[in-house]
UniProtKB/Swiss-Prot annotation:
Keyword Isomerase on entry: yes
Protein name: 2,3-bisphosphoglycerate-dependent phosphoglycerate mutase
Gene: gpmA
CDD domains the record matches: HP_PGM_like
Active-site residues, record numbering mapped to chain: H14 (tele-phosphohistidine intermediate), E92 (proton donor/acceptor)
Family to which this protein belongs: Belongs to the phosphoglycerate mutase family. BPG-dependent PGAM subfamily.
A biological-process GO annotation: gluconeogenesis
Source lineage: Bacteria, Bacillati, Actinomycetota, Actinomycetes, Mycobacteriales
EC class of the enzyme, as a word: isomerase
Pathway assigned to this chain's UniProt record: Carbohydrate degradation; glycolysis; pyruvate from D-glyceraldehyde 3-phosphate: step 3/5
Stored SUPFAM superfamilies: Phosphoglycerate mutase-like
Alphabetical list of PROSITE patterns matching this protein: PG_MUTASE
Length: 251
């Protein structure tokens, strides 16, 4: 770590989940990793080892796909023993009534423009999910202490819940010089990268984060990136993975 750098931040999107493979909107639905997703978690751990990027503390969401990916990666990197903090504010964006629906079918039914608004606009949430329905989380015990469980979210809602947690909690570990691993989701990580890199509400629509490839940020004492945009530990695979994410909704 150079003299100007504070902590090192590593962002990791969970490996491929069962619903990623089926091209379904997932959101807060708690699905398992596929075999490919498990392999991605292992590869992430190998990349951490190869780059001697050894986390001191782990933050994850409350969702199995992020927890499992982190466990596999840390076990592979021989860092399975580090402290772990899990928080709902790192959860994926809640996709409302779209949860459990096929992306290509939603696109066909509502058209490209509406599909992209729901999927990528900053402040247009999908329709709300019916409380008590199959893919709603309003009675899930892990959210019992929330005043209100979301019924839908746009990316702006994720920013509003996540950035105070970043500033109040995660930042302290980075300012103490720790290497912090955050294993989370496409949209919670997009919200954080938007904040770190000062990306506009419009331009964030074009940012896609691939599954299973660690993204390193070196931060100064104000937690501003010394390497804006971060550095993927496998840039070639990251570019291919981001392109695949951008194309979701295709047949």
């Amino acid at each position: 770590m150079n003299g100007m750098s504070t902590g090192t931040l590593v962002l990791l999107r969970h490996g491929e989940s069962e619903w990623n493979a089926l091209n379904l909107f997932t959101g807060w639905v708690d699905v398992h990793l596929t075999d490919k997703g498990i392999a991605e978690g292992k590869r992430a751990g190998e990349l951490l080892l190869e780059h001697n990027l050894l986390p001191d503390v782990l933050y994850t969401s409350l969702l199995r796909r992020a927890i499992s990916t982190a466990n596999i990666a840390l076990d592979t990197a021989d860092r399975h023993w580090i402290p772990v903090i899990r928080d709902w504010r790192l959860n994926e964006r809640h996709y409302g009534a779209l949860q459990g629906r096929n992306k290509a079918q939603v696109k066909d039914k509502y058209g490209d423009e509406q599909f992209m608004l729901w999927r990528r606009s900053y402040d247009t949430p999908p329709p709300t999910i019916e409380p008590g329905s199959e893919y709603s989380q309003d009675t899930d015990p892990r959210y019992a202490n929330l005043d209100e469980v979301p019924l839908t979210e746009c990316l702006k809602d994720v920013v509003v819940r996540l950035i105070p947690y970043w500033e109040d909690t995660i930042s302290a570990d980075l300012l103490a010089g720790k290497t912090v691993l955050i294993t989370a989701h496409g949209n919670s990580l997009r919200a954080l990268v938007k904040h770190l890199d000062g990306i506009s509400d419009e331009d964030i629509a074009g940012l896609n984060i691939p599954t299973g490839i660690p993204l390193r940020y070196d931060l100064d004492e104000n937690l501003k990136p010394l390497n804006p945009g971060g550095t993927y530990l496998d840039p070639e695979a990251a570019a291919a993975g981001a392109a695949a994410v951008a194309n979701q909704g295709g047949k």
